[in-house]
Amino acid sequence: MKSSAIRRSRGFTVFETVIAIGVLAVLLTGFMVVFTPAAEGIRKSINVQQADRMASTLEQELVTLRSEPFTTGFNKAFTWIENKNKDKDALLVYQYRGSMTTLRNDKTPTPVPSVTGLLPGKDYVIVPMVRLRSDATNLKADLEAVEGGVYLVKCTQLVFNSSQLVAGTAGKIVDPISATMSTTPDDYPEAVIAFAAEFHLLPAKTSDYIAGTGFTAKFNTVKNPIFVRNLAVRR
């Protein structure tokens, strides 16, 4: 009888196993280096429609009179653009769930913190909003019903330089042509204030964070906005 030869398969040596583990570690490291920043960018990115909505919300709120002591929408816009580059009165843009039946004293929908058993469009609506950090009571209520992220907005007037509009000095409103300082809305000689609005996504959206020192530190050091829009307000 003819005997059949039994062929034994050879396993990996310890040396080969170590090499394979090393190659795998290099591949995983490369994957993390390439895709982790990309994932972070995707998380922070917003689409054009979202950017348009936030910019429009800011532009509209700047001239909307609520409970502030302003006589005109232009006066409000002048003051907010000039003074709101301080962390105490920082501008915040966000969306929250609002009631379709009840309003607060400032004519904004009452926040709806819990939506259990409720239907959007029937029991509540998503409200785009701009508030000052110093509007603590209303802001805290809004944040309990917030939808999506909260954005810090920094506004800087655009002025003429060599026939081009460029960013001026944050916290100051001047004649965009002569650079003469305007201390009040009545001093401002033009009918339009053009400004650049930087939108920065905040790392947290709780009222404790926004009222605390973490927000102040972020406000003073923030760079690289999610997006920037050139906007304008008119008398």
PLM ranges: what are they?
Residues 12, 19-22, 26, 35-235:
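Flexible, low-complexity segments enriched in proline/glycine/serine and punctuated by aromatic residues
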Residues 1-12:
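N-terminal leader/signal peptides at the extreme start of proteins
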